[in-house]
Amino acid sequence: MKTQWSEILTPLLLLLLGLLHVSWAQSSCTGSPGIPGVPGIPGVPGSDGKPGTPGIKGEKGLPGLAGDHGELGEKGDAGIPGIPGKVGPKGPVGPKGAPGPPGPRGPKGGSGDYKATQKVAFSALRTVNSALRPNQAIRFEKVITNVNDNYEPRSGKFTCKVPGLYYFTYHASSRGNLCVNIVRGRDRDRMQKVLTFCDYAQNTFQVTTGGVVLKLEQEEVVHLQATDKNSLLGVEGANSIFTGFLLFPDMDV
């Protein structure tokens, strides 16, 4: 404590002596300036001053060094679907696939046209050897086949029940000249000659044959007709036969 007071009193005494010296010097007209006193001790720091005005914005600094890569973040949500792209080129044909399973059974079909399944056919022999008059219908009285009974053996005439295309043919044995007509028409009307087959031979056996396709209407009649040159035979070993059958029914009727 004594030391602190001595440190304080010493400078004060020196200051007092200086003041006395100055006062004496001022009272003397010819005194010289005294020696400068010892500097005083620093004063107590003052309080903080008011904040200054903001300074002018400085220039942009240089870019800093690149920082280290951060850790990988979590996967984000899916984005909105983009606009569909253009259609690409057609690809190559792929390999043939395996057969698929059988499909379900289809519905039952409708009833078919009875005409499409209609069957008409006949074959008949002539077994009598009697003479024939010109324009007379030639009877083939022994029936071999007569499906649907459209051929009448007692008259030798075929009557159409199913309109359509028919084929008629005959094989006739004779000894001498033979001419045979194939005729058609309504049985009640005048018959029309379609064609004539002739074969001329004297005193010798021969076989004459002919055939034709006819489009017939319902109830139209077809038969073979004798002429004035007729040596037709109907005996064992020299048979004559008349045949006809339906090729195609007329579906429009």
Swiss-Prot record:
<dbReference type="InterPro" id="IPR050392">
    <property type="entry name" value="Collagen/C1q_domain"/>
</dbReference>
<feature type="modified residue" description="4-hydroxyproline">
    <location>
        <position position="33"/>
    </location>
</feature>
<feature type="modified residue" description="4-hydroxyproline">
    <location>
        <position position="81"/>
    </location>
</feature>
<dbReference type="GO" id="GO:0006955">
    <property type="term" value="P:immune response"/>
</dbReference>
<feature type="modified residue" description="5-hydroxylysine">
    <location>
        <position position="75"/>
    </location>
</feature>
<feature type="modified residue" description="4-hydroxyproline">
    <location>
        <position position="54"/>
    </location>
</feature>
<keyword id="KW-0873">Pyrrolidone carboxylic acid</keyword>
<feature type="modified residue" description="5-hydroxylysine">
    <location>
        <position position="57"/>
    </location>
</feature>
<feature type="modified residue" description="Pyrrolidone carboxylic acid">
    <location>
        <position position="26"/>
    </location>
</feature>
<feature type="region of interest" description="Disordered">
    <location>
        <begin position="29"/>
        <end position="114"/>
    </location>
</feature>
<keyword id="KW-0106">Calcium</keyword>
<feature type="modified residue" description="5-hydroxylysine">
    <location>
        <position position="96"/>
    </location>
</feature>
<dbReference type="GO" id="GO:0098888">
    <property type="term" value="C:extrinsic component of presynaptic membrane"/>
</dbReference>
<feature type="modified residue" description="4-hydroxyproline">
    <location>
        <position position="102"/>
    </location>
</feature>
<dbReference type="GO" id="GO:0051384">
    <property type="term" value="P:response to glucocorticoid"/>
</dbReference>
<feature type="binding site">
    <location>
        <position position="200"/>
    </location>
    <ligand>
        <name>Ca(2+)</name>
    </ligand>
</feature>
<dbReference type="GO" id="GO:0005576">
    <property type="term" value="C:extracellular region"/>
</dbReference>
<keyword id="KW-0180">Complement pathway</keyword>
<comment type="function">
    <text>Core component of the complement C1 complex, a multiprotein complex that initiates the classical pathway of the complement system, a cascade of proteins that leads to phagocytosis and breakdown of pathogens and signaling that strengthens the adaptive immune system.</text>
</comment>
<feature type="compositionally biased region" description="Low complexity">
    <location>
        <begin position="78"/>
        <end position="96"/>
    </location>
</feature>
<feature type="modified residue" description="5-hydroxylysine">
    <location>
        <position position="108"/>
    </location>
</feature>
<dbReference type="Pfam" id="PF00386">
    <property type="entry name" value="C1q"/>
</dbReference>
<feature type="signal peptide">
    <location>
        <begin position="1"/>
        <end position="25"/>
    </location>
</feature>
<protein>
    <recommendedName>
        <fullName>Complement C1q subcomponent subunit B</fullName>
    </recommendedName>
</protein>
<feature type="modified residue" description="5-hydroxylysine">
    <location>
        <position position="60"/>
    </location>
</feature>
<dbReference type="GO" id="GO:0098890">
    <property type="term" value="C:extrinsic component of postsynaptic membrane"/>
</dbReference>
<feature type="modified residue" description="4-hydroxyproline">
    <location>
        <position position="39"/>
    </location>
</feature>
<dbReference type="GO" id="GO:0006958">
    <property type="term" value="P:complement activation, classical pathway"/>
</dbReference>
<dbReference type="GO" id="GO:0045087">
    <property type="term" value="P:innate immune response"/>
</dbReference>
<keyword id="KW-1015">Disulfide bond</keyword>
<feature type="binding site">
    <location>
        <position position="199"/>
    </location>
    <ligand>
        <name>Ca(2+)</name>
    </ligand>
</feature>
<dbReference type="GO" id="GO:0048839">
    <property type="term" value="P:inner ear development"/>
</dbReference>
<keyword id="KW-0391">Immunity</keyword>
<feature type="domain" description="C1q">
    <location>
        <begin position="115"/>
        <end position="253"/>
    </location>
</feature>
<dbReference type="GO" id="GO:0098883">
    <property type="term" value="P:synapse pruning"/>
</dbReference>
<feature type="modified residue" description="4-hydroxyproline">
    <location>
        <position position="99"/>
    </location>
</feature>
<dbReference type="GO" id="GO:0005581">
    <property type="term" value="C:collagen trimer"/>
</dbReference>
<dbReference type="GO" id="GO:0045202">
    <property type="term" value="C:synapse"/>
</dbReference>
<feature type="modified residue" description="4-hydroxyproline">
    <location>
        <position position="36"/>
    </location>
</feature>
<dbReference type="Pfam" id="PF01391">
    <property type="entry name" value="Collagen"/>
</dbReference>
<feature type="modified residue" description="4-hydroxyproline">
    <location>
        <position position="51"/>
    </location>
</feature>
<feature type="modified residue" description="5-hydroxylysine">
    <location>
        <position position="90"/>
    </location>
</feature>
